[in-house]
From Swiss-Prot:
Residues 388-399 have a biased composition (Acidic residues). It holds the Pfam family PI3_PI4_kinase. The gene is pik1. Residues 706-714 are annotated as: Catalytic loop. Residues 725-749 are annotated as: Activation loop. GO terms for molecular function: 1-phosphatidylinositol 4-kinase activity. The modification Phosphoserine is found at S202, S219, S222, S235. Interacts with cdc4 and cam2. This is Phosphatidylinositol 4-kinase pik1.
Amino acid sequence: MPSSNSGNELLLRFFESAHFTSQLCVAYLSRYPNNIGIHHFLCEKLATFPYEEIEFFIPQLIHLVLNKDSESVALEEFIISQCEQNTQCALITFWYLQAHMVDLGLQPHSSCFKICKRLYNRIQILVFMSSSSLIQSQQKISENVTPALILSGIMLGGVCVPELLKKAGPIAIAQGRKAPRQDPDESDVDVLRRLSTEPRYSLDVLRSSLNNSIVEQHSEVSLRLKAPELTRTHSYQSSATLSIDEQRRVLRSNYFQQEIQFLFALQDISIRLIIVPRQARLSSLRAELALLNNNLPADVNIPLLRSYHKEVSHKIVRIDPKEATILNSAERVPYLIMVEVLSGELSFEPQSKKNKAKVQKIVSHKNQRKRWFDLTDVDPYTNLQDSTDNDISESESEGGDLSMSPLIKGLVPDTLSLSKSFSSFGNVSLQVPSSHRDTDVVLLSGRHSDSDGNGALKRSKIYASEITARMRAAATMLSQLDAEGSRRPKAETERIKNSIILDMQRLEEERLNEPSIYPVSVDISCAEDLRFGKETQKAERKGDRDDPSAATFQEDWYAKKERIRKSSPYGHYPNWDLVSVIVKTGADLRQETFACQLIYAFQRVWLECKEKVWVRRMKILVTGDNSGLIETITNAISVHSIKKNLTKQLREAELAQGKIAGKNVVTLKDYFIKQFGDPNSSRYRQAQTNFLQSLVAYSIISYLLQLKDRHNGNVLIDSEGHIIHIDFGFLLTNTPGNVGFESAPFKLTADYLEILDDRFDEYRSLMKAAFKSVRKNADQIILLVEVMQNNSTMPCFRAGENTSAQLLQRFQLQLGDKECDDFVDLLIQKANCSVWTRLYDLFQNITNGIY
């Protein structure tokens, strides 16, 4: 930056002040896209902030680098640099770029697409290639005249002014790496045209590219970039020939390949379940997860839960199929899984004994052609040895899911023909072969040799594969029945469908009664507790067949965690832990992630201002343009489920007493009294305080962000009384059906007022204080919106640049303190028992059965 320019001097002084935050740094990157010097300085400044802050802004940084037409390559190089340093950053960036590749498939000639394509391929090379020479070959200076002339001038000037070479030299070199402007050749255009005419399959093309070759010179996705031909792994004679950095790169590459295929496998399960009737989805899901467990333990984790401060993470050892739950959804099939992990078990430090052996195994090409988590091939007799090679520690040469019992054999005949089997399928019954039970008993007793245990483990995996294959066959037949329903009598179709579904459900009852295969190291003294846990779980499953997620969310998280630990073959490890995530496909979660960013920004403001309000931060991992992982909010249940369950219990009690069941729906206060005791007790008062403080926060957030679709299925109450809002598909400028039906500023129902009771004035007072706090820090919210609103594909930015202008208006910055208090009172008055809120809840109850 020229020091003679007074404006730049003031700007530099501001950049170097203590008040210049990471958020301001991102905002100024957006404001100065065409000033190469400022851009490079800001990227250097951004690199000085903690990684946690940098990761928070990854969506904004990617949006800027793709949509801000700039000659500077500083931001692109900054992103690559961060990905080199941190695996979490590389993974998140990879997924976001993949989603943008799909978005931009219809604009193959745009600069956005070219930048995205270049970055996407560079990230692939970075994370999948184990050879440093391949990565370094991507860092050569291109034939750019202007940077070359500037660099020559800097070198000449550096003779007299050495500082000039030190400061400006790296900028010129970085700019020299900028790819020259050129149009893709005709063959590239043909490839792009195929991508653009089939947008639904573009993500599948990306997946195929990753699975087959990761990055190839002639793949459709890479569009024949001028890059060296890449193979799946680089050939080495021995790990001894590798430097420490190269060994670390081998471990990172191995992690990325397994992690991405693991997440693909989870998403594919959800997609396959779409064709399965709702009554049979739970059984099918658990069979799929049983097969997935054959590849665990593995070098995979849940990126949402990684530590920011070190390249050490948890390692997934098991996903308990019995605990998996289908969430209520008519169109898509999101599901919840309980993931068992060992904390601090996954690292990329090559000098540990375990990682040394792993590096040697990788570079020796033993797993060169191996595909992890490939659930499309369910031949139970293949790749058994590979599935038992994943280790947890040096003392355990074989891992895998040791707790999955053999379930059934003979769900459908092996040679069953779909076109001929419907008439006879209704007579098929599920049986658990006695030989399977005998195997479990031997393993449970611990009286067997290692060879016996290995054989039993392999047989268990064979049976799990058989079950999955037959479950899929049954699901296919069910979908075929729906397709052929008009060509056969309706009664016959229903009979066959019911028979198949009942048999699949009977499988669950059989499984709950089966003992598990435990490793010898497990303490069998807890068997009584395990049987009790199975009985409890069995009762829950029977009681919630119509709503399989109900029991999952009603059970206390810590009790569930302890129950699963006792029944787990890995529960005896001191670093064992349990995490819960939701796998969701068929929905773009980038807007949800952005909403969570904004809500977290509110939370930080209130924490800094020490306001006594409460917000629950949510984490979401975007894994594509229509998929992702969502952190589960534990110990919380929706208001809909609360009212539905209490109403059902009340009516059953009335019928048991010989009374005519009434039609009145219970209130939230009934639940609070049931959950927290007498309204005058200290426990109830604390829950009331928690409700009040969280209601204030979400009332202000709902108004400022214009959160819509606030029915009772999207509002939770946790075990401490806090209210929590979820599902942010409608905010800022988009509304359900593009109709402004929810015109109240926020949701403040009679239920809420009944819980507040005599503390309504306290609610009003805290609303005013919390609103004033966010007004003073409005720029922290508005800047996030301003950065993202241009050229965004998210529905919430339908108004374009007017989005941030409308948000600014809602902050009412022109008002004084007294006028601001009056404004908040007016908002509360409009929201208080709003007729629009009542009508929307009634509409949801009539159309979707939401209480």
